[in-house]
């Protein structure tokens, strides 16, 4: 909520000391679109993580994370009508639904009291789009950058 008016909640379950699976959910609180950092109202994204660490604390250090992402949101767009004698445009608010797949790399630190800090960056690519005429469908790839703090239970 520091950068965006939204919140992301993550659940991660350890498989062993070097891998885990999880799911994260994002809810956007920018209901009127005044910030327009993200068009998604919500996003649900299951993931799998491979950790590359030689330390005694399991599931920390560098990781690679493939993910799938299911999103829904809304955006505003203009539609233009051109002909020889007349020019017109209308403003529409449209809903979208999308499915994306991607990967990211990151690093996770865990202290002795199990507080966690994590940074990651990656890219996702839309693989299913609802409509080829909307802005969201014109963007086929999107960045994914994350700074997270939390507590390991």
Description of each model-found segment:
Residues 1-39:
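Start-of-domain marker
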Residues 1-3, 26-28, 67-71, 122-126, ...:
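Outer-membrane beta-barrel pore domains and translocons
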Residues 3-5, 38-44, 60, 95-101, ...:
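Residues that define the transmembrane beta-barrel architecture of outer-membrane proteins
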Residues 13, 50-52, 107-109, 125, ...:
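Residue-level signature of outer-membrane beta-barrel architecture
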Residues 17-18, 36, 53-61, 111-116:
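Short loop/turn motifs that connect adjacent beta-strands in outer-membrane beta-barrel proteins
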Residues 21-25, 44, 60-68, 99-101, ...:
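Transmembrane beta-strands of outer-membrane beta-barrel proteins
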Residues 26-41, 70-97, 127-138:
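Flexible, solvent-exposed loop segments that connect beta-strands
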Residues 141-153:
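Outer-membrane beta-barrel "beta-signal"
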């Amino acid at each position: 909520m520091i950068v965006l008016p939204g919140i992301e909640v993550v659940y991660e379950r350890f498989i062993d000391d070097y891998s885990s699976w999880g799911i994260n959910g994002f809810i956007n609180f920018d209901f009127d679109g005044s910030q327009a950092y993200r068009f998604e109202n919500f996003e649900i994204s299951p993931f799998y993580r491979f950790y590359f660490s030689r330390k005694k604390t399991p599931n920390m250090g560098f990781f690679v994370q493939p993910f799938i992402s299911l999103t829904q949101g809304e955006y505003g767009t203009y539609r233009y009508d051109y002909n020889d004698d007349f020019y017109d445009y209308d403003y529409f608010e449209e809903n979208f639904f999308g499915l994306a797949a991607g990967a990211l790399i990151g690093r996770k630190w865990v202290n002795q009291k199990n507080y966690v800090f994590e940074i990651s960056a990656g890219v996702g690519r839309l693989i299913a789009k609802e409509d080829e005429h909307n802005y969201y469908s014109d963007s086929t790839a999107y960045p994914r950058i994350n700074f997270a703090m939390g507590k390991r239970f």
